Regions:
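Basic, polyanion-binding surface patches
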Residues: 1-167
Length: 167
């Protein structure tokens, strides 16, 4: 059954759903390439795998399929300027070389990310306007978020993760 919910109503509902802001990156013949994304989640612990939903017209879409690898870099509140850079620049201009290095697959990873998942491309599935990209996690790197929580997108603005005081 096709949904009868109107697109603006769906978009408003999803704006209320907080999501971790990530930089999804890979390499291409023109250098590093990536996008900012919130449609990322774990798929399975055995085997360790994740999924990323990437618009079929996004600059990184075909590059991930061609490279066969990608990295998901969870951003912290320190990375608001990086999000702006990704929205204002294109291609390799989004990447300040001193901040990025490969882990295992060759995909660029952010040196001070809250978390990095370095993945090999495992499978893809059609998701209407998007491709659901499944990655096998080849390497992980956990950063420090003690002084800066994870960067979230909630109600169409930046938010931060922070622990709640137990009651």
């Amino acid at each position: 059954m096709i949904s009868t919910v109107q697109v603006p109503d769906f978009q408003q509902a999803m704006a209320s759903f907080p999501g971790g802001i990530t930089a999804v990156t890979t390499h291409s013949t023109d250098g590093p390439i990536g996008i900012i994304a919130t449609a990322v989640c774990s798929l399975s612990a055995e085997p360790p795998s994740i999924l990323v939903c990437v618009h079929k017209h996004a600059s990184v879409h075909d590059a991930i399929l061609d490279a066969g690898c990608f990295a998901v870099n969870l951003l912290s509140t320190r990375h608001q300027a990086l999000v702006a850079r990704f929205s204002q620049q294109r291609g390799a201009a989004r990447f300040e070389p001193a901040l990025w290095a490969p882990l295992k697959t060759g995909a660029p990873t952010l040196s001070d990310a809250a978390l990095t998942l370095d993945c090999t491309l495992l499978d893809t599935h059609d998701g209407y306007s998007h491709t659901i990209i499944v990655g096998a996690v080849a390497a992980t790197k956990v950063g420090d978020t003690a002084n800066a929580g994870c960067l979230l997108w909630h109600d169409r603005t930046f938010a931060r993760s922070s622990p709640l005081v137990a009651y």
